[in-house]
């Protein structure tokens, strides 16, 4: 099992180097331009201040930049950190919704992935922009502006069956979430469907999950203020995702959110309609909005987190590994990132 952290703040690159020293395997840079630092700047600095940790996006959003630009960006980072970069690609839940826009649809996203994949493989590919199609490829490779000689893995973000199938069809890996991406067996079944559609084998395919981890202190309960502060922002990020999903698709919310669902909708709908989309995602994986703390109940913590004492968390992680999970990512509140990553490294990773 590999473990990854998330670095999103341009002036705290030392956190990524610290995670490397603690034994973490990789680091994501997030791509939410209205609430975080620019991911490519973060990765460029991290590449120069680290030696072994793998670096990439979690996730680079298709709707924010042209596919050739995204391919160039990660290939440029690969020039600084050859052989230890990857690119995670996604349709853009938070990044697009903070602009009041929907995520990219699956069909254009699949085309986006196809172009990025071909360019990073050094291939010529037909590229369409504004209705005009031309063949394109990276040029002047001998001048070493970028590096595509060292392979760059493409991981596809997918919480639903179509995106998960697309990962199997075009990706080198899947990035999903627990629980909002469904169970691991369900996700893997979707991946295999996509691979079968493309006639691909899934050799070296990597499954990564964004997981909310919560380590309890001796005698601590799920109602403690420390617990709520530590896991609250991650739990509410999942709630925010579901609010948009249910609104747009009309599907029923999952059972695990039922205890707070209507109360949260009433709270959210009372916000100013013109800026509601901003308020919903402002705290995204960074801090717990004090007005939302009341929704972080023991029932919600149990539904959204791998929680327990170290030996209990280790047992649950091993169970996920047995189901086919290869890597775990987690995102800590900004003001606790050093303490939580250190504690997890010493009490969990070191014992696995």
What do these predicted regions represent?
Residues 23, 46, 77, 116, ...:
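Conserved, mostly hydrophobic/aromatic
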Residues 3-5, 27-29, 55-58, 85-89, ...:
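Hydrophobic faces of well-ordered beta-strands that scaffold small-molecule active sites
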Residues 8-19, 70-73, 158-166, 309-319:
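Short, acidic/polar
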Residues 1-58, 152:
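N-terminal beta1-alpha1-beta2 module of alpha/beta enzyme domains
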Residues 1-10, 60-68, 148-159, 213-216, ...:
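Active-site mouth loops of central-metabolism enzymes
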Residues 102-145, 189-319:
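An alpha-helical appendage that flanks or caps ligand/catalytic pockets
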Residues 26-49, 61, 93-96, 178-181, ...:
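Glycine-rich, proline-tolerant flexible connector loops at the mouths of alpha/beta enzymes
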């Amino acid at each position: 099992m590999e473990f990854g952290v998330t670095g999103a703040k341009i002036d705290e690159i030392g956190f990524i180097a610290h995670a490397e020293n603690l034994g973490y395997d990789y680091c994501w840079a997030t791509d939410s331009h209205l609430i975080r630092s620019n991911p490519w700047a973060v990765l460029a600095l991290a590449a120069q201040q680290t030696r072994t940790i793998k670096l990439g996006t979690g996730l680079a959003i298709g709707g924010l930049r042209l596919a050739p630009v995204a391919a160039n960006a990660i290939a440029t980072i690969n020039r600084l950190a050859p052989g230890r970069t990857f690119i995670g690609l996604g349709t853009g839940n938070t990044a697009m919704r903070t602009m009041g826009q929907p995520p990219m649809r699956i069909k254009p996203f699949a085309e986006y992935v196809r172009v990025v994949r071909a360019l990073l493989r050094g291939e010529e590919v037909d590229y369409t922009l504004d209705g005009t199609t031309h063949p394109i490829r990276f040029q002047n490779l001998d001048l070493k502006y970028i590096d595509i000689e060292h392979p760059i893995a493409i991981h596809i973000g997918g919480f639903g069956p179509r995106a998960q199938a697309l990962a199997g069809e075009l990706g080198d890996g899947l990035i999903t979430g627990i629980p909002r991406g469904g169970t691991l067996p369900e996700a893997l079944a979707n991946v295999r469907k996509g691979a079968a559609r493309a006639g691909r084998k899934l050799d070296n395919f990597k499954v990564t999950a964004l997981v909310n981890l919560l380590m309890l202190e001796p005698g601590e309960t799920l109602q403690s203020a420390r617990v709520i502060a530590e896991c609250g922002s991650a739990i509410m990020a999942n709630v925010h995702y579901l609010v948009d999903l249910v609104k747009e698709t009309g599907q029923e919310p999952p059972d695990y959110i039922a205890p707070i669902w209507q109360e949260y909708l009433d709270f959210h709908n009372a916000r100013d309609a013109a800026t509601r989309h901003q308020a919903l995602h402002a705290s995204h994986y960074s801090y717990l909005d004090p007005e939302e703390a009341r929704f972080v109940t023991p029932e919600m913590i149990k539904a959204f987190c791998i929680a327990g004492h170290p030996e209990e968390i280790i047992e649950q992680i091993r169970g996920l590994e047995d189901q086919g999970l290869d890597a775990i990512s987690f995102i800590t509140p900004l003001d606790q990132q050093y303490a939580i990553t250190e504690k997890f490294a010493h009490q969990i990773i070191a014992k696995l």
